[in-house]
Amino acid sequence: MRAVLDPNVLISAVLSSTGAPAQVLSHWRAGAFDLVVSDRLLDELGRALRYPKLRSRITPAEAADLVRLLQAAGVVALDPPEPPRRSPDPGDDYLIALAEAERALLVSGDQHLLGLAAAFPIRSAAQFLDLLRPEPAR
């Protein structure tokens, strides 16, 4: 299975070690799925991790380490050129296009994107965890 994690999911995973986003990241580290990243996604993540409101929660070195880890261990894909407009926030369209181009599921905490789940393979971190967990034996 392949997944694109919205930068908001990655940031949530860093800020709280107990929530669904952190569990998703742990599953990736354990090899449960391939994490698809792109230069644009990594740039957005790096910028967001430097926001003043996050600096008290994550050091610049920790932020840089995370971006390097994702770049080194993730599946680095090319950013699709000029993604079509699909999301109420045009800044998120590249995530949908990246997931589609890489045949991956998009995992997001953004309600605008989650509202498009009927048309595109988009799930919340909790919903993605349900897909990763094996079904109990009957």
Located regions from the model:
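Short, well-structured N-terminal submotif of metal-dependent ribonuclease cores
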Residues: 1-37
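Alpha-helix N-cap/helix-start capping motif
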Residues: 8, 18, 39, 64, ...
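Residues that scaffold the ATP/ADP-binding catalytic core of kinase and kinase-like folds
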Residues: 13-14, 48, 57, 116, ...
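Residues at secondary-structure transition points
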Residues: 19, 36, 58-61, 86-93, ...
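PIN-domain endoribonuclease scaffold, especially VapC-family toxins
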Residues: 27-82
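A short acidic, often aromatic-flanked loop/helix-cap motif at beta-alpha or helix-coil junctions
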Residues: 43-44, 83-86, 128-133
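Active-site neighborhoods of divalent-metal-dependent phosphate/nucleic-acid chemistry enzymes
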Residues: 71-105, 111
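Acidic, PIN/NYN-like endoribonuclease modules and their adjacent C-terminal/linker elements
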Residues: 103-107, 111-138
